[in-house]
């Protein structure tokens, strides 16, 4: 099998000439609004923190993930200021979300079966143990962050052949780190099946290449990338802390999941694919693993509000259709 590789110019790490606004003390209005948030939400409930740290195995020693030249691709300790209590200048709910999202490393989700890399990029990277290797779900945004996570798995769990890579959907933070897996797996890239939803490649090119310049510029504002990372600047993006600024690539799927969904057995692991197009992404798949009683929700369900309209200009999501997909998942796999 010959793998066709195409690299995208994703405008993730372009420099911008922005003048930082002077940091000022929060107004009385801001302070009162933030105080009201504290009163309206159950901040004494620490279950989120227990969930976010459960199964922690290890993380890297370095303060950041860098490329081959030593340039920072993704900062880790830069978010350490979030350890303190929320200041009057910050929305305490977003601050708490940042505290959760800054937790990073390798986690065991299901003993001996499912492992996850978190906090190395905006998305997570998941490893499913098959009979003779690994099935990888989503590969982060950059080669560097994905490789840091992959090496952590090899070091603390096991270095096994990669049997398949599954893209859940064509948002760049879920597929662009693919080269880290293909170039560093112990088996040949040609032996790795790449699975994605129907229409994945077309949707990835449409959003990230055709509209890449404009969307990249808007994303800079949306994520507050040029703001300093401190209590009066960037404290996170809600869904994750920030996006990586490294090497990106795109390898088309070798197999697409039909819109009707289907069931596959990959190296002994049964996977029931549920196609959910037109909701969180133009094309997307969720997965149920009957043998493990595990369900991968892709980005249809998060511990955030459902993102119906992104400020970067992605397609508007169909909220009604989205809700029906969640109902279907509960009915069929709950």
Residue ranges: model-predicted function:
Residues 1-8:
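Bacterial N-terminal signal peptides that target proteins for export
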Residues 9-16:
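Bacterial N-terminal signal peptides
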Residues 17-21:
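Sec/Tat signal peptide C-region and signal peptidase I cleavage site
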Residues 22-102, 326:
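N-terminal pre-domain segments of enzymes
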Residues 99-160, 285-289, 293-299:
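Conserved beta-strand hairpin/beta-sheet module of binuclear metal-dependent hydrolase folds
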Residues 109, 134, 141-143, 195, 201-277, 321-326, ...:
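Metallo-beta-lactamase
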Residues 132-133, 143-195, 258:
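Active-site metal-binding motif and surrounding structural segment of the metallo-beta-lactamase
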């Amino acid at each position: 099998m010959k793998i066709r590789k195409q690299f995208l110019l994703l405008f993730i790490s372009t420099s911008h000439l922005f003048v930082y606004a002077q940091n000022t003390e929060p107004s009385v209005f801001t302070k009162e609004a933030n105080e009201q948030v504290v009163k309206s939400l159950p901040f004494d409930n620490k279950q989120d923190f227990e969930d976010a740290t459960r199964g922690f195995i290890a993380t890297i020693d370095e303060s950041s993930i860098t490329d081959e030249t030593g340039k920072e691709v993704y900062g880790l300790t830069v978010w350490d200021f979030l350890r303190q209590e929320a200041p009057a200048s910050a929305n305490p709910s977003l601050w708490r979300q940042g505290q959760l999202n800054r937790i990073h490393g390798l986690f065991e989700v299901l003993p001996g079966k499912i492992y996850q890399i978190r906090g190395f990029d905006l998305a997570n990277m998941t490893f499913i143990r098959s009979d003779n290797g690994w099935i990888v779900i989503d590969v982060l945004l950059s080669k560097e962050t994905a490789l840091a996570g992959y090496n952590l798995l090899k070091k603390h769990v096991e270095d096994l052949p990669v049997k398949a890579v599954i893209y859940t959907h064509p948002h760049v933070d879920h597929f662009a780190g693919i080269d880290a897996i293909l170039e560093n797996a112990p088996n040949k890239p040609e032996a790795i099946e790449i699975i994605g939803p129907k229409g994945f490649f077309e949707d990835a090119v449409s959003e990230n290449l055709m509209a890449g310049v404009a969307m990249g510029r808007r994303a800079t504002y949306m994520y507050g990338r040029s703001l300093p990372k401190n209590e009066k600047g960037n404290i996170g993006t809600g869904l994750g802390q920030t996006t990586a600024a490294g090497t990106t690539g795109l390898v088309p799927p070798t197999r697409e999941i039909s819109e009707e969904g289907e069931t596959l057995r990959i190296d002994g692991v049964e996977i029931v694919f549920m196609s959910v197009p037109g909701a969180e992404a133009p094309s997307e798949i969720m997965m149920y693993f009957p043998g493990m009683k595990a369900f991968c929700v892709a980005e249809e369900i998060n511990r955030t509000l459902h993102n119906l309209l992104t400020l970067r200009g992605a397609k508007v999501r169909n909220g009604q259709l989205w809700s029906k997909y969640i109902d279907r998942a509960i009915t069929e796999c709950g």
